[in-house]
Amino acid sequence: TGAGKSVCYQISALLLRGVTIVISPLISLMKDQVEALRQVGIPAAYVNSSITQEEFYHTVQMVQQGQCRILYVAPERLMTDSFFRLTQQVPVSMIAVDEAHCVSQWGQDFRQSYLDIPVFMEQLPARPICTAFTATATKQVEADIARILKLQEPEIIHTGFDRKNLFFGVRRPNNKTRELFQLLRENDGKSGIVYCSTRKAVEEVCDALRENGFPATRYHAGLSDTERAQNQDDFLYDRQPIMVATNAFGMGIDKSNVSFVIHYNMPMDLESYYQEAGRAGRDGSPAQCILLYSGKDVRTNDFLLQRSRETTEVEDEETRQFLLEQGKERLKQMTFYATSTTCLRHRMLQYFGDHSPDSCGNCSCCLTNYREEDATTAAKKIISCVYRAQKGGYHLSRTMTADVLMGSKKESLLRMRLDQLSTYGIIEKLSRREVMQLIDELIQREDLALRQFQEYQELVLTAGSVEIIRDQKTVMRRVPVVREKLAAPVGTKDPTLSAADNDLFQKLRQLRAAQAKHEG
């Protein structure tokens, strides 16, 4: 993310004869990149569902007359008769597949239409050079891309996933809105993005920020094209330095001075989180990437995964089930990151197959003091609760298990007669949050597992559960010595400015905004 993937195929296109076809799933990104190329004198165009038939014919004429060097196209248009005829009439020098992870069922954003790409290339008069680009491919996805696109002994270039100027942090606040306010005060006068998982959350968070004096705007697919464009410009030119948005915002946005990215809700997978967080600090300056986590995020994402299974364009039932299972596995890895007590950067880089030290010194886990605590007794109580619930015919989720162990008086729990279990209320020395954290740690260690049951995931026992009960394994957990305090990223100073410095800072912001507008 932000490493210059687009430049790779744009410069290559200028060195080749004929037209370069860039396959991209993002209509807004096509428009932005074509406009940027035209501003520097490079003839480019795009073909997608947003253009009229007249505009398409005009684009065809440009390509036929050699007046277009780079043609962006949506994957859905590749196999249409009109586009096929065009590609038979002009020399295609290169195919550039952007967001190439979309071709793989192992990827976080599989698109059925991407499977048309190898078929399309086979129908061309001569097979052109094929290049593929992605910011978020695991080793498995990388191999899948090469196989599906039929790349013969491809040159594979890794720029690495580590962005050393980014500080990664996770907070688990009781009140996310209050925590967000505090983070924004710590970054007063700076530009940043607040990501939310739903349109409703975007509206609520943006309204709350405005009501409390924060200069915020919003972006999601439910807004009109005009409003989205206006809000995007307000953010790019620092008229509204805080953008509250769904993941519909940010792809291809070239704004270098984003000082923070805050995730108000946890994304579905580490690929999405890395890509969205990576929009911070593109100028190389220290920047913060903060995740505000709660257990509710897991339940929300699990619901969204189930819903996506029903709305996917994939018709084959077996493939749909496979995609759902892959989504659940990615959500599990994302949850492991959010609940980790070890280096966040190491966990993320390890997921993508990058080597890294066990400790980076620039994440909230590395900068928090922990002590080791024997939690075997509490773990046995959790495992016993799951066992006795299953024996009684119950299917308990993570939260239901914690409620039983804490002796909750919730009406739903009492109605199910869960208070009759012998493990009801047997944990007294831990808070509910600590019980939930220990459950998550047991899942990470594979001493418990999650299994789909109806509309939610239930806890089930594993071989590790038996080992703990039989005293063949101990459970040690890391406990913060003091309440986690988010340290400033490496290289930053106290954010408080004097009156004179603040006046100068505001003038510099105005100057930068004017320059950005002038340069387009």
Model-derived segments and spans:
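Broad structural signal for hydrophobic residues in well-ordered alpha-helices, predominantly aliphatic
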Residues: F120, I145, M348, R512-Q515
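Accessory DNA-binding and partner-docking regions appended to nucleic-acid-acting proteins
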Residues: R299-T300, T311-E317, Q326-K328, L344-H346, ...
